[in-house]
Amino acid sequence: MAEYTISQQKIKIGTTSDKVANDALQVQISWIIFNGDASFRRVQPRNPVTFESLNAAGAIQLVTRYSELNLDAKAFTHGLFNPDRSVSRAQDFGVGINWYLNHNIKLQLSYNQTHFTHGAVARFDRPTEKILFSRMQVAF
């Protein structure tokens, strides 16, 4: 699955205003590697965990994502944002594993790295952010 968007906004800070156009994209690829059927609605485990079958396996999915945000250079050159405190580009790459216990419960574990470029003090980039996070999703 992939998305691309362009956002145009008129920004006014104090007496300074300008119209800026930012763009962003996201690409995600996922694979059901064990015991499930994929669809655009929800993953359906072939052997779901229920109260009657607590030793069932559920379904396992691997996911990889890439996303990017590009801010309009006019926002910095016309004084709307401070180039010494902000970056104009962020790129994120992530991998994850999802465990679908059944139709209603999903456990997620993901790792992401975000690289920031084109900005910050004296044009030095901010350090890369790294995050490991987990989530439990209940859908009904």
Regions found by a protein language model. Give the residues of each.
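Outer-membrane beta-barrel pore domains
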Residues: 1-140
